[in-house]
Amino acid sequence: MNALQWSFRAQCLTGFLFCTGLLAYAIFLQLHQGLEPCPLCIFQRIAFAVLGILFLIAGLYNSSNVYTRKAYGLLIFLTAAIGTGIAGRHVWVQLMPHNTISSCGSPLSFLSETMGPFEVFRTVLTGTSDCGNIDWRFLGLSMPMWSMFWFVALALLGLLVGFKAERRKPLFS
């Protein structure tokens, strides 16, 4: 069965299931494998959660209005683009030599208690050497590289579900 021909609802719920699976695997690695997430990892998880919620709402609402579907597709694409940017920054921090990145910063909980939300976001995006550690690889790619791959794939899925031309029923059948 061709997934490109699935209904709007099926494609959105598939996107939701992918986001849920990615988050579940990240939590599994944290709780059972002992991989503690850095602040950039947490922001990527938040982006996957928001993506999953958008896919779920779009799939459950299942609007037949073309403009509503385009709005969902655009929101999903923009959220995935933000996630891609965060993951890209994380990959860049990992690929930089460790002595060029500032020393380990404070934990995210401490930052959120002492700073405003925008300052926390700016501080986290500067990256710490903690974010530069590569603790996990699969097929030669680190976790942020895989996150970036999935953000791009989900962005393309968002564009597909939002801007896919609907088949018109024949006038005479």
Curated annotation (Swiss-Prot):
Keyword flag Flavoprotein: no
Q: Name one GO cellular component term.
A: plasma membrane
> Which residue windows are transmembrane per the record?
12-28, 47-63, 71-88, 146-164
Keyword Cell membrane annotated? yes
Which Gene3D superfamilies did the record assign?
A: DsbB-like (1.20.1550.10)
Q: Which GO terms describe its biological process?
A: protein folding
- Cite the ranges annotated as topological domain Periplasmic: 29-46, 89-145
- Localization per record: Cell inner membrane
Query: Under the GO molecular function aspect, what terms does this record hold?
Result: electron transfer activity; protein-disulfide reductase activity
As for what it does, the entry says: Required for disulfide bond formation in some periplasmic proteins. Acts by oxidizing the DsbA protein.
Report the PANTHER family cross-referenced here: DISULFIDE BOND FORMATION PROTEIN B
Provide the family line: Belongs to the DsbB family.
HAMAP family, per the entry:
DsbB (MF_00286)
Q: What is this protein identified as?
A: Disulfide bond formation protein B
Name of encoding gene: dsbB
